[in-house]
Amino acid sequence: MPKGYWIPHLDVSNPQGFQAYRNMADAWHQTNGSKLLARGGRREVVEGKMRGRNVLREYDSFDLAVAAYHSPEYSRAHPLREPHSACDFLIVEGYDGSQPQSADAPPAAAPLKGYWIGHVDVTDADDYKPYIAANKMPFGKFGARYLVAGGRFEVKEGRQRARTVVLEFPSYEAALACYRSDDYQAAAILRKGKAEVDLLVIEGFDPSKH
């Protein structure tokens, strides 16, 4: 069964006031079976724009992720952040299809993964397809694995583009290197003028720093 993901993007105006939300939500997350994949690590917005804080949280299914958002526990925590932040909050279904073919010598795995979080509005679907075909090689070369590519989604707060893609890499360095590689940049040229993209590269969550 495909996983489900919370992807909130936030701008926090009052960190001290926001902390009460964090404390309550984090305590509940420790009991609800979800897994925090990314929050608070190194990050680089490589295309478009993103809010200042970005979170990637995994649930066992899309339905569970939606139910968690509407749960009594989160409904009590949620209002605590509203006066102190602006948020675009997306819940999206995970991907369970074929993955890029891995290279013979992919990048070494690091203790913390790296992720791409991309939000896309495709303006020319037919001419966008060559980009999809061309990105498979660099994704395989750098050990990428799709977590999200299409699937059901719900925008719970704010706004978001029509498509979301999340890729997991063996490390933050591998995620950045893939984007900057000649092979990926050659693929990216193929989508220029065919899509509007906001793309973030973010380091996996490090529990030792939180």
Question: Model segments located where?
Answer:
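Terminal low-complexity interaction tails
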Residues: 188-190, 205-206
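Short S/T/G/P-rich N-terminal loop/turn motif that feeds into the first structured element of a domain
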Residues: 1-56, 60-70, 74, 83-84, ...
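A common structural junction motif
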Residues: 73-79, 183-189
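Broad structural signal for hydrophobic residues in well-ordered alpha-helices, predominantly aliphatic
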Residues: 28, 80-81, 190-191
